[in-house]
Amino acid sequence: SENANAFENEVAGRPYFFLPLIYKIMDGEEISRYYVIAGINGLVKGNYDPTEFAVLFKKIYKEHIYSSFKRQLIRMTGYLNQNDLIDQDLFDFLCDIALNDPDPAKVLNPNNQIIDSFNNNRGMAVHEIVRCFRYKRFAEKIFLTLFKVANDPMDSVRIASLIDLAVLMNVD
């Protein structure tokens, strides 16, 4: 929605000012979840403190009410990943999506499966899993997950595992 986008931009400009409001609307039911997601996206855009962001993110990422925003939640894990804040729970969250999420159910862009890989939940999760190569403790599960993804029925998901495969040369 246009108003949610405006809210996201306002939060990006003043993330610390809007944080209490984001927490308040997270706990309420009368305001659309679009605003919660927009506010959290604004925190990422505004380079809000990554450690504090991780605390906020962990309050919502497993909540069923946010399942329709899964792609945006996956994208937000990139902010945590670039700040070395992926823990076992978040990594497992990504692996579960990569292996079990129903999206994609069909090919969206048959002429460009690479683009398609960035526009579905399983593909995006695979991209983010590969980017977790810096975490030595996840090395085995990264490869196990990619091995399973190789059998995914959707080309775009399998392609997602190949795009960044070269970075895994850094894993022992």
Task: Annotate each language-model stretch with its function.
Residues 1-172:
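Non-catalytic all-alpha helical scaffold/repeat segments
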